[in-house]
Amino acid sequence: MEVAPLVAEVLKRQQVHVTFFAANERTKEGDGSLGDHWAPWWRARAAEGHELASHTWNHTYWRADAGSAPHPAFRVRPSAGPREGQSFVMSAAEYCEEITRAADRLKAISSKTPLPLFRAPGGKTSAQLIASAKACGYAHVGWSPAGFLGDELPSETASNTALLNKALRDVRSGDILLAHLGIWSRKDAWAPAVLEPLIEGLKQRGFCFRTLRDHPDYAAAAAQVR
């Protein structure tokens, strides 16, 4: 969240709306990204017209399926929360609670109902996990291959210039782009350094930007929320 205010400034200046997927991760300031310290930031983004969705409460990574129907379960490893770094088995109902808890907190602090979508940390899923989430009302959203903007990669091997040039070359219409509100391990921060020239460059190529509410793959699910 360290660069979140700068990202918000760029998006506002460029008149671009995005979909934020949020988990309650550790932050340098405050009591987590969905804590009270950052609540005004989320409220302001919702008021500006951005969409919100769940990234699971404890940024919980799926590792493997650990049970099958009619009692699906998953081996998981959260990267936040009281069980950070631990590997354990979570029932489908417990995983749904992970999704719902983040969505409920977003609604509470922003006064805006999140979209019935979620993104699994790392994009790691199984057919069974996706089916279990769908059963409790959430569709999973990944990203396009060209939409992986590389802000998680080491800056020593993936410079901002190289990442910008790759995205400007490869992004196509309909692609879902993925970036973060700061990556602890990256020395040369991707945002906002790359974000604004990327938006400007894609606009010059004739692109416009929409939230997932308007994406053809997710519009039907998003229409459930007004």
PLM features: residue spans?
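Active-site beta->alpha N-cap acidic-glycine motif
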Residues: 1-90, 94, 98-115, 190, ...
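C-terminal domain-boundary segment and adjacent tail
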Residues: 13-14, 18, 187-226
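Structural recognition of the beta-strand scaffold that forms the well-ordered cores
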Residues: 18-22, 51-56, 116-120, 139-144, ...
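Short histidine/acidic/glycine/proline-rich micro-motifs that form metal-
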Residues: 24-29, 124, 147, 183-187
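Charged helix-capping and loop-helix junction motifs
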Residues: 34-38, 159-163, 191-195
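Basic- and aromatic-lined ligand-binding clefts that recognize polyanionic substrates
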Residues: 108-133
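His/Asp/Glu-enriched short active-site or ligand-binding loop at hydrolase and phosphoryl-transfer sites
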Residues: 124-170, 206-218
